[in-house]
Regions:
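Catalytic palm subdomain of template-directed nucleic-acid polymerases
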Residues: 190-203, 222-227, 256-259, 263-299, ...
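Conserved beta-strand/loop block within the catalytic cores
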Residues: 90-168, 246-274, 450-451
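Catalytic-core region of right-hand nucleic acid polymerases
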Residues: 20-21, 28, 108, 116-118, ...
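Mobile genetic element proteins and their domesticated derivatives, centered on retroelements
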Residues: 11, 78, 97, 104, ...
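Long, charged, low-complexity intrinsically disordered regions
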Residues: 1-76, 92, 96-99, 106
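A short, polar/acidic, helix/strand-boundary loop motif
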Residues: 151, 507-534
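RNase H-like nuclease module associated with reverse transcription
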Residues: 412-416, 483, 522-642
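C-terminal reverse transcriptase regions that engage the nucleic-acid substrate
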Residues: 168-171, 221, 304-451, 608, ...
Length: 642
């Protein structure tokens, strides 16, 4: 019944989607929550409501309740900072405030006493946030604007974030073309950019004698919704002044054609931007950083060889074959995550759950999260489980390929996790505690590819005169060429409840692992043959995007990508023109893969299951098989000192 007294019939599914809470509460009040249309959905919806309310309450009180960090009392206001310094007999907090104000003062333009804020400008609050650095317990103060009071800008609001696969490609190219890699961190990055919003504020006590005066915010102050986009635009204008061009495949990668002075060979220099972290790849990278420093001040201690990037330790390594290559090691991030997890279990959850002392593998043998029927977690434990999955997914992104399939499996239960799922996540943390050392090396060495394993055929009769689409606006290819290989696999009906299969994909540029995927397939396949088709089609689509990105980065790419699969029937069906379509349900995958082969974009061959490195991304593996396959991907993981 509507407010005007009229009535109408509405689909229950529509009401569940548009007004879930009201519908669930009505079912409870009317006593029909036991009906088939409600019996599972109502308690799930109400539990979700309670969880959201609980999380909001915790977030509102978390900052106020936290009084200490690393055993040091942290103030909430400038007045409290003064009191703490007087009580402790030092000026540590006031020094931190003074340091912040020296940098941020230029972001404010005082409004004369006889004037008011310009018409159209919105008043917002500003406040000081305090923190303590873990490395040296140094006090830190940051003045932030109350951007939550303003409307979201119509244009983009995000900062520069270069993709992870672009970082891996760039590091491999640096070693391949013998280029330097240097890093820099922009000092107070957002403050260097002009403010895009019309806002003003009343200055607080941190401004000293100017406290109480009105001021227009003229710089992209931290906290403003447009601050990230403002800095991004400011940085982009400077990159263009340096004659760098934004890559169309990844706008936060900037490239420029350069000539090496020692042998006059031409190549592309790259600048990668991740918010305020800059990675420069050039034959004289420090000179580029010095020029950037003239416009965007860089932290002096950050300029030079890279140390930590994206949460992982980045360093150059000499391989057994004598080649120098860059590698990412997330060991420090892993150790800190395990330590934080142990602290939370002890202090917040009262020791109810524990990290196992020994865990040789990410999952216990014979454990399956799909069939776990333990009790659902309460809201606090559910939130902790979701936090753990987020942390471990980032570990996978920065190189822990060995836990990819287990984390992917648990990620399917974020909305309704059970006690067994949390215990499985803690088992992964126990495994990481034991196997914390690992390195992902971006080896530029060319792989040994026997092209006789990839026979060519005439596909004209079946697909006509097709050819790979080459971007018309790609830059001139410079530098050394790369080879691309992909290994695909699937675990047919691996999910015990939905019977969906799991895809595993590994993509290499030369010997450098660039992309990896462990993901449930969207369809339910009735055969191993069909699941392998879906996996390879997914891989072909990713390969096409990677080939486009490489070309838009100016990387020479003349040959096809070499694809390996371990299902001989499916490989033959894809690579031999006369092979026929066996099921109509496979027609899209069948033609998509075969057309890729016909246009010369890919070539496909068979590989034994024992040699398929993508196998550990489709299902949990154990013992010698796991050591052999993952040992070919990650360095240090199974070394004796681990």
């Amino acid at each position: 019944q509507w407010k005007d007294g009229s009535t109408s019939w509405e689909r229950l599914a529509d009401l569940k989607e548009s007004h879930p809470l009201e519908t669930a509460e009505f079912a409870m009040t009317a006593g029909i929550d036991h009906e088939p249309a409600y019996n599972w959905w109502v308690p799930h919806t109400l539990k979700k409501r309670d969880r959201i309310i609980s999380m909001v309450k915790r977030r509102n009180t978390r900052y106020l309740k936290r009084t200490h960090k690393f055993g040091i009392e942290v103030p909430k206001t400038v007045a409290e900072a003064h009191d703490l310094d007087r009580k402790n007999g030092n000026t540590l907090w006031m020094d931190a405030i003074a340091k912040e104000m020296r940098e941020v003062r230029k972001a404010f333009e005082i409004i004369p006493d006889d004037q008011t804020a310009p018409i159209g400008y919105q008043k917002i609050p500003c406040h000081m946030v305090f923190d303590i650095k873990m490395e040296d317990f140094k006090r830190k103060a940051r003045l932030v604007a109350g951007g939550h009071k303003t409307e979201a800008p119509a244009t983009i609001t995000y900062a520069s974030v270069v993709s992870r696969e672009t970082v891996r490609i760039a590091l491999m190219l640096a070693a391949l073309n013998d280029l330097q890699v240097k890093a820099g961190d922009v000092l107070n990055a957002y403050i260097t950019a002009p403010c895009k919003e019309k806002v003003w504020t009343v200055l607080g006590p941190e401004f000293g004698s100017e406290a109480g005066k009105g001021a227009i915010i003229v710089r992209a102050l931290y906290g403003l919704k447009s601050a990230g986009a403002a800095f991004r635009a400011h940085l982009a204008s400077f990159m263009r002044q340096m004659n760098y061009t934004s890559c169309k495949a990844d706008p936060d990668l900037w490239y420029k054609a350069e000539t090496r002075p020692d042998d006059d060979t031409r190549y592309y220099a790259y600048i990668l931007v991740y918010v305020d972290d800059i990675l420069c790849i050039h034959h004289d990278a420090m000179s580029v950083l010095d020029r950037i420093n003239e416009c965007l001040p860089l932290k002096p201690q950050s300029m030079g060889d890279p140390d930590i990037y994206l949460g992982a330790k980045l360093r150059e390594t000499r391989l057994p074959n004598g080649v120098w290559a860059w590698g990412l090691s997330p060991s420090k991030y892993v150790n800190q995550a395990v330590q934080n997890c142990q602290t939370h279990l002890t202090e917040k959850l009262g020791g109810t759950f524990k990290i196992p002392a020994k865990a040789a593998n990410p999952f216990p043998e014979n454990y399956c999260p799909d069939t776990d029927m333990t009790d659902p977690l309460d809201p606090e434990c559910s939130s902790f489980f979701q936090h753990l999955i987020g942390v471990m997914r980032w570990m996978v992104e920065i190189g822990r390929v060995d836990i990819a399939v287990e984390v992917s499996m648990l990620s399917s239960y974020l909305t309704l996790p059970r006690e067994g799922h949390l215990e499985a996540a803690l088992h992964i943390m126990g495994y990481l505690k034991q196997k914390h050392n690992s390195r992902l090396i971006f080896d530029p060495t060319y792989p040994l590819i026997d092209e006789s394993d990839f026979p060519e055929h005439d596909w004209t009769e079946f697909y006509g005169d097709v050819s790979e689409a080459i971007p018309h606006d790609m830059p001139e290819p410079l530098g050394k060429e790369v080879d691309i290989r992909m290994m695909t696999d699937s675990d047919h009906a691996g999910c015990k409840t939905t019977r969906r299969s799991r895809t595993g994909i590994l993509i290499f540029c030369n010997l450098a692992l660039i992309q990896w995927i462990s993901k449930r397939q969207p369809t339910i396949e009735t055969s191993v043959f069909g699941a392998e088709f879906v996996a390879m089609k997914h891989g072909i689509e990713i390969l096409r995007g990677l080939r486009y990105k490489l070309r838009m980065m100016g990387v020479p790419l003349t040959g096809p990508s070499f694809v390996y699969g371990d299902n001989k029937s499916q490989v033959t069906n894809c690579s031999v023109p006369e092979s026929t379509l066996k099921k109509k349900s496979h027609s899209i995958c069948y033609h998509a893969i075969r057309e890729s082969v016909a246009m010369g974009e890919t070539r496909i061959t068979h590989i034994s299951t024992g040699d398929n490195l993508a196998d550990p991304l489709t299902k949990c593996t154990f013992g010698a098989k796991r050591r052999r396959l993952l040992g070919n991907i990650l360095y240090d993981l199974y070394d004796d000192f681990n």
